[in-house]
Every structure is written in structure tokens, then in C-alpha cells.
Amino acid sequence: MIDKIERYFKHFDFDIRETHNARFLDQKVTPDVLSIVIDCTLTYIQNNNIDEFTSTDIRTSDYSNENIIDIFGKTDVNNPKAKNEYDKFFHQPLKALASAKILKETKRGRQIYFTILNREILEYISVKEKNSLEFLNIYLEKVLRDSSIWHLFENFFNYPTKDNFDFLKVQYEIFIIQHTPINGKTEVRRIFPKILNTLSFKRKKHGTIKGRFSKDIITRDELMYNRRNWKDISKKKGETRKEYELRAKNEVENIKIAYVKYTLNKAKNIIKKLHLTTSEVTDEFANGEATQIHHIFMKSQYPEISSYLENLILLTATQHFTQAHPNNNTSLINKDYQLLCLLAKSESIQRYNHIYSKEDFLYVIKIGLNYVFPNEIEFDELQSRLIEIYNTN
């Protein structure tokens, strides 16, 4: 899928000196926000059977409200007091994708309407934060290369020192102020960390924290809007340290639970949409409508991969309750049928490689079987090796 995105971008020139667009990325465009906003967008389009939409349409949809409140610990999306914050939360990712030519924007009066230019890339972004991050990395590098300032970033990545960071930051500010309507450093400095840290994380490099050169290599958590650390939650006035710590940790735990629930439900919906009512396992029990989403490696035993698409497979009720789980006992797994599910899933992953990830499938196998395969392994060899493993255990 990365190759497809790169090929698609070759049709466009994102040179800031020509577009004068300083907001090709904005503050709210983080991997987690971008992914969930696009998931909300695609869900809204499907539910309403429309081609054109506004950010307000997405913001006020039931699906957005159900998930944003719990996952981000926010108030109701229709709360008037939160309107300004939510407008940015939903609008900025859509604007960024319009800049990237994934969406098309049309202004009529004061309202901006969006339509889809590349659904495949949108679906890829919506699947998981990891995909969203891959997209942002490709897009940002493309913008900076087209604008002939990539060498400034490359120099910093090759020689990550405070002096080189300061030089990069100043040169970027000068460039943006010179070629876009932004005329002050403050606004440039709000957006710069989102750009640098996204690129830094992918390259395992230093970046920027609170406007300064980071002492450590940028971590994934630094990129996210939804920081999953209780210390990021503010202490309330009059609250004791113990009360604050207990409340903050509970809030973070509730957010984590909500996020796992959301990702699992999203994964199940994606699989049903991909495979419709046809079982992924072709055997004598595949007749009839496939309605059951089965965890190849049990959710109770392997919670860390419970919401991975590559660990979920669509089966008929007969397959699920008589083959995958012997005698309808969902606490047991039929190892022979587990192998069939893995082999069938590998076929699905090859067929729908813009949705599934071979790398994530290998991770699922690593957790479930405690066996590591190299990322370079071909699917034919992988299938043969899986058969060997199950036949010798």
C-alpha cells in the first residue's frame, strides 16, 4: 500500500512556493485523530449513502459522538461550549487530506464541502493509527521534497544536534513566512512539531519537545493527540495528590478500555464489509451465510492482538461453533481448524493487501505461536512453515 500511495502522489506537485499552503498539516492532524476522523467519515457516507459532506456532518453524527467521547475522554460533540475545539478536531484532518488530494474541497458561501478522490487510501488510513502514521510520513516527505527544503530535515536526521535543530527550525520559519500568508513565528511553531516529530519517529531520531531539541528519540506517544499517560491529565484545584493520581489513572484506564472496544468493533465491521456473507474458510461447513467473527488466537489468552484484523476471521455459524470451538465450547480451540483459519487468513491478506498487513499477520503469529518469521518471507513459504509447525506440535 505504501507503494500505491507514493505512486499516487507522483501525479501532484505539493510545492509550498506554488500552493502557498502553510496548513498542509495542522495541529489536530495526529495519527490517532486522522484515523478515527476518517473512520467516522466513511461510516457517515455509508450510512447516509451520500458523496458530499461537511466536517459538521461528520462531527454531529451518532457514530462520532459514541466513540469520541469515550476514546478521547471528551464532552458530547454537540456541546456548544466545545464547538470550537471539535470544529478543529474534525475539520483540520479533512483539510489536510484535501491538500494531499485524497479529498476534494469545494467552497460554497461560507461552507466547505468535501468529496472523495481516493477511497482506497482513505480506507487504509481509517483501519489503524499505524496506517495513518505511514500515510503522514509519505505525505510530509513529499511536500518537503517538492518544496526543496527536504535537505534541511535530512541534515538534522543525519546529524541530530541542538545546533542543527535550531538551524532547521529557523530556516523552516523563514521559508513558511516567505511563501505563505502566515506572517508570524508563533503560528509556524505550533505546527512545526507535528511535522518534525512524525518524520523523526519513523526514522528513530530526535525531534522536538516543548519547542526545544528533544534529549531522547521521539516515541509514538509523543505523536498522539490522545496521550495515554495519567500524568498528562491536569490536577483539579483542591484535589489531594492521592485523589488526583487515583482519578487520573482511572480516566486513562477507561480510555484504554474504550479504545480497545472501538478498535475491535471497527475491525469486525471492516472484515464483514470486505467479505460480505462469504466465509473466509472454504470447506464442507462453509455453506450458508457467514455471520461469525472468530478470534484465531483467543481474545482471553492473547488480549494484545484481540483487535488485530489479521487475528479475526469471518466464518459461518457451523464453522464457528462446531469446528473452531469443539462441541460449541468457546473456551476451547480446535488446533487443526486454527491452522485452516491461519492459512485462509493468509489468502485474504494477499487479496486485500490495502486493508490487511503482512507485517501485522506475522506479529499475530509471533504472539499466538511464539514463533518469529522474517518480514521478507513469501506467503507460499509461510503457509508451508505453518503446516510444519502444526504437524510437529
What are these regions (language model features)?
Residues 114, 314-316:
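Short beta-strand element of the conserved SAM-dependent methyltransferase core
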Residues 2-263, 332-340, 346:
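Mixed-charge, low-complexity interaction segments
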Residues 101, 295-300, 316-320, 390:
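Short, flexible loop/turn elements at secondary-structure junctions
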Residues 310, 317-393:
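C-terminal structured domain segments
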Residues 24, 49, 273, 381, ...:
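Acidic/proline-rich low-complexity IDRs
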Residues 276-313, 323-328, 335:
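Histidine-centered nuclease catalytic patch
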Residues 253-292, 316-319:
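Short cysteine-rich loop/turn motifs with clustered Cys
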Residues 85-86, 96, 271-278, 294-297:
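Short amphipathic alpha-helical surface micro-motifs
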